[in-house]
């Protein structure tokens, strides 16, 4: 039976009729006569540019993704009266500033669209989230509807922040990488703001933080020198994440009354005794450059602590709550010898990073059998790794940032790991033996190591650098091993 073209179109319409989402690319181009009749279609991603497709988008569409297509004429959007989500980012030559967008839009992404006139936004009375980052500086007075809850203005080089004071419903604000001199320190930000990112933006001081009593997350960057005593961080009761790594710790850290869950502290090689009072809600803690072994006493009070990371610091013993799951020591030292026996009590420990200048009693202690992941960045620990023998649940083994002139032998053939990773060990030579259980090898290393790639029967994936590409493609040409070049 011969079918007419109209019959074929009808069959295809019935085939696609109930689809809610379609992605159009070079390999999946839909007939425009079918597309415009898909009345149930809600979400459309167009990755392949075709003007006929744009002019036949169903008017009932709710979400449209047309990023980086070099579209010039966006007039077709005005017909989409039900659209709530619109992504037109990276269309640098479009006429977006000259059209009236549908009032229904709640999410608009026009990042990197070469915009300098933003008045078209004022019409969007239902707008909740707006991304206009990486565009040109313009006049923002009376541009943004007060409905906006999230606003991303990264890298626009804002000079006058006065417009933000009117956004009374604003909760999340990203003004990072605005390096031009501006008046932010004179602005009274809306109290509604809970998340503020001003990373690497120009600021004369932090006076603008005073009004942000509801802030939940904040990170101090290194654009200006600031002392902790200059900022009363204790008044931010709703804080959940705080990064003060770029603050000079010249006063006590008193935050026990907050809702803090994560904090990063840099002691800047100080040997001062600091009173640290953190809430029991804390789950993640990072301490850097602490040269005073007495500044860890507060850890025992943190009964919900799950993760601790200690970097370039002095520590002799770790006394924390027994429920801790992740412990990472990176480039750490001790005034005498770190007592590894203190790790035996952490029966829920999942991940352990061992970066110490000595191994003292590591091979004599009995590490928790709960450990599934080990990360090592000390050559002496690699050479004497008997402590691994009792880790029956170990699945992941990583060698990180080891530099040595000798050839290092690593025998893991009897340790039933599934994932092995070596990274940042430039100019170091290894002789590595892995078990048959190995499934993933990450070889982010610029030297060819002595490793028998062929014998691992369970191997599924290798991630490596370009220098190993030809060798591995040849070895695994007719196998199911996936090779990813990074």
Swiss-Prot record:
Annotated LRR repeat ranges: 18-39, 43-59, 60-81, 82-103, 104-125, 126-147, 148-168, 169-190, 198-219
UniProt KW RNA-binding keyword: no
Name of protein: Uncharacterized leucine-rich repeat-containing protein AMV014/Q3
Keyword tags: Leucine-rich repeat, Repeat
UniProt organism field: Amsacta moorei entomopoxvirus
């Amino acid at each position: 039976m011969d079918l007419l073209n109209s019959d074929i179109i009808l069959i295809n319409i019935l085939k696609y009729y109930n689809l809610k989402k379609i992605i159009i690319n070079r390999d999946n181009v839909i007939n425009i006569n079918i597309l415009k009749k898909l009345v149930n279609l809600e979400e459309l991603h167009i990755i392949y540019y075709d003007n006929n497709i744009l002019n036949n988008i169903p008017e009932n569409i709710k979400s449209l993704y047309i990023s980086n297509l070099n579209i010039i004429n966006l007039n077709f959007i005005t017909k989409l009266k039900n659209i709530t989500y619109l992504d037109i980012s990276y269309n640098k030559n479009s006429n977006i500033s000259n059209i009236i967008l549908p009032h229904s839009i709640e999410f608009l992404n026009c990042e990197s669209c070469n915009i300098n006139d933003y008045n078209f936004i004022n019409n969007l009375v239902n707008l909740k989230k707006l991304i206009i980052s990486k565009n040109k500086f313009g006049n923002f007075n009376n541009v943004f509807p007060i409905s906006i809850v999230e606003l991303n203005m990264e890298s626009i080089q804002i000079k006058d922040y006065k417009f933000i004071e009117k956004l009374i419903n604003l909760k999340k604000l990203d003004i990072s990488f605005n390096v031009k001199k501006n008046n932010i320190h004179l602005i009274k930000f809306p109290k509604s703001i809970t998340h503020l990112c001003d990373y690497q933006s120009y600021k004369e001081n932090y006076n603008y933080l005073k009004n942000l009593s509801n802030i939940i997350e904040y990170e101090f960057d290194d654009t200006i020198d600031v002392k902790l005593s200059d900022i009363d961080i204790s008044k931010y009761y709703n804080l959940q994440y705080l990064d003060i790594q770029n603050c000079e710790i010249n006063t006590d850290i008193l935050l026990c009354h907050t809702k803090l869950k994560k904090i990063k502290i840099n002691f800047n090689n100080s040997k001062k005794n600091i009173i640290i009072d953190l809430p029991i809600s804390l789950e993640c803690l990072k301490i850097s450059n602490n040269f005073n072994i007495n500044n860890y006493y507060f850890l025992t009070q943190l009964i919900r602590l799950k993760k601790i990371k200690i970097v370039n610091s002095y520590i002799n013993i770790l006394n924390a709550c027994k429920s801790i799951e992740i412990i990472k020591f990176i480039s750490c030292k001790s005034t005498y010898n770190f007592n590894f026996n203190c790790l035996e009590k952490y029966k829920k420990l999942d991940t352990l990073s061992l970066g110490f200048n000595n191994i003292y009693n590591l091979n004599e202690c009995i590490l928790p059998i709960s450990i599934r992941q080990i990360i090592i960045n000390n050559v002496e620990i690699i050479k004497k790794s008997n402590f691994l023998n009792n880790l029956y649940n170990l699945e992941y083994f990583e060698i990180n940032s080891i530099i040595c002139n000798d050839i290092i032998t690593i025998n893991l053939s009897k340790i039933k790991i599934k994932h092995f990773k070596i990274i940042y060990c430039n100019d170091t030579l290894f002789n590595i033996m892995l078990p048959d259980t190995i499934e993933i090898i990450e070889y982010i290393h610029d030297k060819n190591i002595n490793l028998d790639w062929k014998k691992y029967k369970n191997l599924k994936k290798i991630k490596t650098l370009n220098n190993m590409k030809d060798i591995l493609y040849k070895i695994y040409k007719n196998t199911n091993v996936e090779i990813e070049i990074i």
